Amino acid sequence: MGQRGWPPEATAIVLHDALGRWPEELGFQPPVGWIRPEAHQEADVNRPTFVSVTAAALVPGPTAAQHVDPALISYFQEQLEGHYRADMLLGPHDLIGTVSAQYQLIDKLVRSAQGETRSGLLRVGAAYAALVGWLYQDAGDLGAASFWRGITQEIAARSRDRHLFGYSLVNLAQVRTDLGDGYGVIDLCEAALVDDRLFPKVRVMAMQQQAHGASLVGDRTAVDRLIDVADDLISRVDDDLPWGNACRRTPGYLEVQRATCYGRLGLGREAESLWSQVLDAVPATARRDRGVYLARHATAAAGAREPEQAVDIARAAVEIAVETGSARMRRELGILEKAMRPWHDAPVGRDLAGILASVNEGS
């Protein structure tokens, strides 16, 4: 808390980011011992970026009390479904600000709501935080993604909803997957699966993510076992929760995961065969996901010693990568570039370099 008439440090930082001036430059009388945040020794933190990432989740209180209509819960749930659809079409950059602002509003309402209305808002708030985390992850900012995955876990714990809490652990495991920490992924997914009362959807999510962890540590047997068990469960996914529905929205969801794991394990021919089947079922509306799958398919073709096919597939992936700005897609194309190194000096390698130039220029 700041002294009377002097804003708390978090507010001082927001004022500076908005107006370019510190409170004492705006006429406030600084308290004894005040040190501007920029003077602290934090060379490893880009404070403006940090504040912009965290601001929606760290609003200081108290806030003014207000009546909260229970109908707002369904309103935010309906908006969430629209955001999921937009994410598939647009990619992360056009949505982060909108979804973060809605999370901030939900957080404000939670502070005034009572009883079941408050519990319902906490549950939907956790889903919004999870989506913000995913958007940052897709944009390639794993630090911001980790922060928002942590907020998801906090809100899930506050909601006392075991299914949401399990979902939040899977969210954390997704970040560990992108960090290449296979054992971290396995630990988090096993922690989620300890609770055998979880809805089938959450168990499916945890098992497929654990399969990714297994692929990172080179365990194909575990990959197949986990995907097969999840496949036995997926027909029982029948809840009406607004979050975590990729397993229902994504055609061939589990085979997508298996193909990705096989590619990571270096099983080029097996992965290439699976991607050929999976991509036939992916709708044009799932443009961002299709781009990621195409990039992985191209890498699998390279692993199967089919460089010309890899380059042909890469053309379509690059077009989508440029449109969506997905860092995840650029990362997949970077993996393809490494897989094509044996043909670096061949005409097909030069063709790939030309195709990837538009992505590399925009990164």
Model-derived segments and spans:
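Recognition helix of helix-turn-helix/homeodomain-like DNA-binding domains
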Residues: 1-7
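DNA major-groove recognition helix of helix-turn-helix/homeodomain DNA-binding modules
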Residues: 7-25
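Compositionally biased, long intrinsically disordered regions
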Residues: 24-74
